[in-house]
């Protein structure tokens, strides 16, 4: 890969994510020009898993700091069968609790939240810290889009559910823990 191709691809993917999220994901809204960090972990996991599959790897899980690209399920050598990966979503109010489990053979999952890194996501519309959700998990075919949309849901909160009715997001699922009178609801 050349850096020019990577930059061009990332630029285009960021533009698509901005459009799909009504601007809630906007890497151009930061001072200094362009910050695609809400998309690149998922993009990197996709790229690495695609390289592995092209090299003949049938079963892989690529973890880019919690954003996962999953290919081919995992081989249970005891049972002699391929099973989907079981991926748990953590409760942001009690990190020892799993609140949802997804079974994924081929696809991606990304979670964005404030429970590990604190309030680090900026609402591009207001310039203030995003308070739309406590955590957002998106499951779908492409890690870059899961990553970007999970970031956008942190900005959009409950209003962001409408984005998942767009044809481009068919097959993508959202699971969010929202803020409500200082309590979490799912």
Q: Model regions: which residues?
A:
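Mature catalytic core of soluble alpha/beta enzymes
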Residues: 3-186
């Amino acid at each position: 890969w050349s850096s020019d191709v990577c930059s061009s691809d990332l630029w285009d993917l960021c533009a698509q994510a901005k459009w799909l999220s009504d601007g809630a994901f906007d890497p151009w809204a930061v001072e200094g020009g362009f910050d695609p960090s809400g998309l690149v972990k998922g993009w990197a996991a996709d790229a690495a898993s695609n390289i592995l599959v092209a090299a003949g790897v049938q079963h892989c899980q690529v973890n880019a700091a919690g954003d996962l690209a999953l290919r081919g399920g995992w081989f249970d050598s005891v049972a002699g069968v391929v099973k989907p990966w079981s991926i748990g979503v953590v409760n942001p109010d009690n990190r020892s609790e799993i609140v949802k489990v997804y079974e994924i053979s081929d696809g991606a999952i990304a979670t964005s939240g404030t429970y590990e890194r604190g309030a680090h996501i900026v609402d591009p519309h207001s310039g203030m810290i995003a308070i739309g959700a406590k955590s957002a998990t998106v499951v779908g075919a492409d890690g870059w889009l899961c990553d970007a949309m999970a970031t956008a849901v942190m900005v959009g909160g409950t209003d962001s559910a409408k984005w998942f009715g767009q044809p481009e997001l068919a097959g993508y699922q959202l699971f969010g823990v929202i803020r409500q009178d200082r309590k979490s609801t799912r």
